[in-house]
């Protein structure tokens, strides 16, 4: 009996070790940049990596920064965003390891690169709006808590990657093992600009309850919440409501 318990304990510890060592392989799913996108790229100054940005450059005060979801080639979002924001310069960040950027993705690296991108863009554009989708929502809310963005839109966001992982692996001490926690709720209360949280009605990846939990951490009156009916995690951008929401729609639910 003692031997059996010891074997089970060793197997469990071994599985914990595998989860710890390969956790970033389970979190990030880098995609190459499609050669068919036709978009040019800029190189962002970054420590230890060549980080690419797909731009649509424009003069004037307005700019939009877009941080995409996991396994997303953000360059494909450029045509739609260009139509929706005709007078804006647009910058789409290819995370490290994604879309031709070198290096490996991590929470710290994504946060640092987003700050660098903002600082570089802010030198030419006074009014910067930020959109973060799914994985990118964590990058966007962190950025907005530290820099003077003018508006923030979070599409299918989570309150904490740590909480999502704990739900997915309930029998493992995920909170102790996870390196990249993406605790967006910690940053939400420091965001002072108008914020829109957009959830998919039938999100099978990030439960709507996670988006609602994040929403509750924003200051009272700072954020609004919108559920896009009939959409899932990956189809929300196909809704006719999607681009108007990114551009700026009337508030559905205010609070925090």
Protein language model annotation of sequence segments:
Residues 191-192, 197-203:
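Short beta-strand/loop motif that positions the catalytic acidic residue
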Residues 205, 231-241:
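Catalytic histidine-centered segment of alpha/beta-hydrolase-like enzymes
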Residues 4-45:
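An N-terminal hydrophobic leader/cap segment in hydrolases
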């Amino acid at each position: 009996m003692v031997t059996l318990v010891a074997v089970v304990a060793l197997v469990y510890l071994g599985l914990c070790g595998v989860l710890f060592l390969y956790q970033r392989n389970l979190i990030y799913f880098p995609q190459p940049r499609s050669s068919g996108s036709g978009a040019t790229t800029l190189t962002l100054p970054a420590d230890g990596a060549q980080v690419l940005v797909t731009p649509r450059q424009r003069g004037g005060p307005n700019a939009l920064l877009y941080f995409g979801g996991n396994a997303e080639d953000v360059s494909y979002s450029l045509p739609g965003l260009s139509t929706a924001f005709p007078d804006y310069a647009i910058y789409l960040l290819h995370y490290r390891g994604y879309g031709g950027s070198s290096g490996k993705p991590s929470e710290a690296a994504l946060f640092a690169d987003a700050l660098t991108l903002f600082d570089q863009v802010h030198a030419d554009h006074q009014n910067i709006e930020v959109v973060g989708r799914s994985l990118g929502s964590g990058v966007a809310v962190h950025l907005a808590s530290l820099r003077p963005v003018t508006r923030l839109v979070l599409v299918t966001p989570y309150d904490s990657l740590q909480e999502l992982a704990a739900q997915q692996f309930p029998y493992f001490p995920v909170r102790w093992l996870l390196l990249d926690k993406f605790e967006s709720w910690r940053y939400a209360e420091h965001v002072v600009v108008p914020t829109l949280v957009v959830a998919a009605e039938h999100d099978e990846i990030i439960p709507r309850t996670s988006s609602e939990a994040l929403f509750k951490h924003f200051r009272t009156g700072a954020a609004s919440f919108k559920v896009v009916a009939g959409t899932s995690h990956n189809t929300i951008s196909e809704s006719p409501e999607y681009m108007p929401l990114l551009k700026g729609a009337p508030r559905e639910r205010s609070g925090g």
